[in-house]
Amino acid sequence: MDLKLYDTLTKDKRAFVPLDPRNVRMYVCGPTVYDFAHIGNARPVIVFDVLFRLLRHIYGDSHVTYVRNITDVDDKINDRALRDYPGLPLNEAIRKVTEKTATQFRADVDALGCLQPTVEPRATDFVLPRPDGKTDMVSLIKTLIDRGHAYEANGEVLFDTASMPDYGQLSGRKLEEQQAGARIAVDAHKKHAADFVLWKQSSADEPGWDSPWGRGRPGWHIECSAMSAAYLGETFDIHGGGLDLIFPHHENEIAQSRCAHGTHAMANYWLHNGFLQVEGEKMSKSLGNFVTINELLQDWPGEVVRLNMLKTHYRSPIDWTLKGLEESAKALDDWYATAGDAAGSAPADTVMETLCDDLNTAQTVAALHGLRHQAEKGDAAQRDQLAASLRFLGFFSETKDAWDARKREASGVDAAQVTALIADRTAARARKDWKESDRIRDELAAMGVAIKDSKEGTTWEIAR
């Protein structure tokens, strides 16, 4: 089956044809580690993990390179370092901030069932020319100046957007129509309002590197142009990120990379996931609905969070609700109950078909429910396919018994008490005391325990 992906640049869904099937290359913008990642940050992590898994399935594990960067130089990081570690030298304070948040981010990603990317470069390692000759930011800026695409002004180096005739293709913003806005800083020394910073001066209390333009630090956009080229080359297959990055970040990445390398494209496919809101409102600290991934994982297993993300197509907006989490938890309970201890074979064709249709995970989840219904009727093959499909998607990371034990522990239900009540109920049923049997059943239900009678005896689980 052919993989089709929606390309933001061309505005259509088309067949994915890699530049080299033996070396499929994908870059996704990672976190800026000034604070712990929030649930909105989890969406691209999960979405592009599924794509990474799918590409590996199609082309082979060793033939796919996935780069997701860590931005560890940023004005917000600088502010956080000065606030949290006022007594330390700035560079040491910055490292403390970024190490703590980057370590937590990796732990969050693991808990969400995501594979680690092939490479996870840090921006600070690519500012200056490197011993290994990989692309760096200073050299890239020099090239842009030499080719007439950048200029020095007021101690900064800026990209000359007018030097690129088709600037604005990704976002659909024509250069002449662009006005100063919230994300475009307008200064008198700019040739055009849309010109953006490649290199800026650093004061004594800001991080900086010595460069041909004085001590300073890179602009946001040049970082990803350098790191992607360093590992994936001048043109690669897929570039991903959130919708909020289309402009200005990805637009400016394209401008820098194409103009520096003289290429027709930076990436051949541009994928963007939709926005996330919480209970119908924009997530923000001021509304009190700002939740970090780590905070969410204190209350919900990573697999529940993962499924809740994947129930919605990645390009659609998602409303993050408690009801949705509860429904996702119930679905996983059902899947574990049906196939949690199945050996598994290969993912079902219906699952792979939905994924190959622009990562239509909403339909994938529907296909998983269909497999479960067939498995519940005694279809062993469907049961194995359900288990294999879920493992392929990053679920079933633990045994059925471990999943059930986790659920019981989280519920606070006393397992010994439940076992004793079930024994009392079994005895009541044996003497045909149906009133007592029903009373015990109701008592268990009030505790949040659901029971199931079969020829083998009575089993129980925590009711969601």
From Swiss-Prot:
A motif ('HIGH' region) lies at residues 31-41. Keywords: Aminoacyl-tRNA synthetase, ATP-binding, Cytoplasm, Ligase, Metal-binding, Nucleotide-binding, Protein biosynthesis, Zinc. Binds 1 zinc ion per subunit. One of its GO terms (molecular function) is cysteine-tRNA ligase activity. Zn(2+) binds at residues 29, 224, 249, 253. It comes from Afipia carboxidovorans (strain ATCC 49405 / DSM 1227 / KCTC 32145 / OM5) (Oligotropha carboxidovorans). A motif ('KMSKS' region) lies at residues 282-286. Monomer. Its cofactor is Zn(2+). It is an enzyme of class 6 (ligase). One of its GO terms (cellular component) is cytosol. It catalyses: tRNA(Cys) + L-cysteine + ATP = L-cysteinyl-tRNA(Cys) + AMP + diphosphate. Signal peptide: none annotated. Gene3D superfamilies: Cysteine-tRNA ligase, C-terminal anti-codon recognition domain (1.20.120.1910), HUPs (3.40.50.620). Belongs to the class-I aminoacyl-tRNA synthetase family. It is found in: Cytoplasm. HAMAP family: Cys_tRNA_synth. Its main location: cytoplasm. This is Cysteine--tRNA ligase. It holds the Pfam family DALR_2. ATP binds at residue 285. InterPro entries: Cys-tRNA-ligase, Cys-tRNA-synt_Ia_DALR, Cys-tRNA/MSH_ligase, CysS_C, Rossmann-like_a/b/a_fold, tRNA-synt_1_cat_dom, tRNAsynth_Ia_anticodon-bd. Its EC number is 6.1.1.16. One of its GO terms (biological process) is cysteinyl-tRNA aminoacylation.
